[in-house]
């Protein structure tokens, strides 16, 4: 295991995606709250707004949107980087020099995405809840302590567990697909662009597929 390269990839992924994930998380929390308020107010259920929005954000919206951002930023980057190394024969040169390209390039990137995507989801969840608090305060005068109390009345470990668990699978899939598309790149620079594009498309599809499977498993095992 190339630990130095793995740590480097973790920092690279964090620096590449954290600002976008943080901003998107805040906006998601704010927008979902603003859009949910009229429907809940129509039924006189405004007091349930923090609870409903927090569960929706943590269980479904934030993990999926964060994974899609990572698929676009990280998946395409890995596909393009390894594709470029493939067409310029840098990977062949690594094999000739005695370096295992799969350990150095593939394993480190897959493990980095598998670790970092859940961490980004947790960060985005936290920021999204602050965005939701701003949205609630635009409609109601609610103290932060009361807001947090209302959130954790309904938001439980059974909401957080499926979210974090499927995020590990999102990260693994994004890294594995990016590496696979990069390693099978052909046809020079045109192939590099195709590798990056196909990595994003396939990663996006797999993210939704994993999310569907996770939802079904949560329902089967009554993690609701």
What is each of the regions a protein language model found here?
Residues 9-65, 69:
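Active-site cofactor/substrate anionic-group-binding motifs, chiefly glycine-
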Residues 100-121, 195, 199:
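Start (N-cap) of specific transmembrane helices in multi-pass transporter permeases
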Residues 196-214, 218-224:
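Helical hairpin unit composed of two closely spaced alpha helices linked by a short loop
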Residues 82-107, 189-192:
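Short cytoplasmic-facing helical segments at TM-TM junctions of multi-pass membrane proteins
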Residues 1-16, 187, 221:
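N-terminal, non-cleaved signal-anchor transmembrane helix
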Residues 15-27, 62-67, 115-124, 161, ...:
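Hydrophobic alpha-helical transmembrane segments of multipass membrane transporters and ion channels
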Residues 49-92, 120, 177:
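Hydrophobic alpha-helical transmembrane segments of multi-pass membrane transport proteins
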Residues 35-58, 126-168, 176-196, 218-224:
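Membrane-interfacial helix-loop-helix connectors in multipass membrane proteins
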